[in-house]
Amino acid sequence: SNYVEAVLPDGNRLAISREKELTKKELDRALYRKLKEITGRSLAWGVLTGVRPTKIAMKKLEEGMDKGAFVQWFQKENLASEEKTILAWEIANREKELLDRLDYENGYSLYVGIPFCPSVCSYCSFSSGALFDWKDSVEAYLDALCKELAYIGKVSVEKKLNTIYIGGGTPTTLTAGQLKRLLDCIDTYFSREHLLEYTVEAGRPDSITPEKLQVIAEHGISRISINPQTMQQKTLDLIGRKHTVSQICDAYHTARSLGFDNINMDLIAGLPGETLADMEDTLSQIKELEPDSLTVHSLAIKRAAKMGRSDEKPSVGPDTKEMVDEARRVAKEMGLLPYYLYRQKNI
């Protein structure tokens, strides 16, 4: 037999596979059940942590498994709730529709990072610095970046460029002239013949100006992201985002007036001091703006973030799950359907 019987500390017996991965999964389930019994708590994703559930669903989808079989298998394998199991399946199907448009054999995506921000948010762990501290290095960085883009364009000339994403940091910390220089450089070295999406993460509204948006529009960029994270002024002040709620709305309306018809907005659930009522108010304001897509993160404190190094490191608030559920409900009201699920960690 490929199984041996093990006796757990509480006296229960468990059949354990001789295969290492199966053994780990069986022990995960046994531990989860015991902790659930002791604490009275159950987790929506069961034993899963630190993974993208849709990656598992995608694998089964590509193997030809149907929805009914997947739901039964996933719940038994991971002790996940039926709601989350179905969510993973539905998102995997939407992901597949999008990914099937890409050329996996000869296609590629280009990410361009701008590691500067107006100020560093207290929760942020990305490799970026405040523009005030690095303003004398921006031109040198762009010089090096354009050289690298020229090289990548040359070595990738036989491949099909599917997507471009300019992120950071905050790309709009560049001046309008610097932004034009960067976008001109990309236009010089890369063909758009096979391009499906071109995104600039416009980011924080305190760095977005009509002139910069005009430069982005003139380069035919199809998608931008304007990221409030919250529409609560008290929270914006607390986390080091030196802008106002009205600046968020102004940046959004300016982008619409210039013809941008694919605008994403980012929110974070569980920011310090925020309640479910705060999240409901934020979502109400976002709903009025009507962005074309919405990205919702739950607060994750990394060691590299200021907040992570603080003596008063905040924990995930009790309302965070309800905040995420409310965001999902409002997004559905807005006609938005989930097409991507981030790695699930504190679940």
Task: Please place each PLM-identified region on the residue numbering.
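Auxiliary Fe-S-binding modules of radical SAM enzymes
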Residues: 1-65, 72, 301-303, 310-347
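Short beta-strand motif preference
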Residues: 4-6, 112, 226
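Short, glycine- and charge-enriched coil/turn segments that flank and shape catalytic ligand pockets
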Residues: 10-20, 65-68, 154-159, 194, ...
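N-terminal [4Fe-4S]-dependent radical SAM core
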Residues: 35-42, 62-110
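Residues at alpha-helix termini
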Residues: 37-38, 76, 218, 257, ...
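Canonical Radical SAM [4Fe-4S] cluster-binding loop centered on the CxxxCxxC motif
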Residues: 105-140
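Short glycine/serine/threonine-enriched helix-capping/active-site loop
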Residues: 112, 296, 341
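Conserved non-cysteine loop/helix-boundary elements of the Radical SAM core domain that shape
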Residues: 128-326
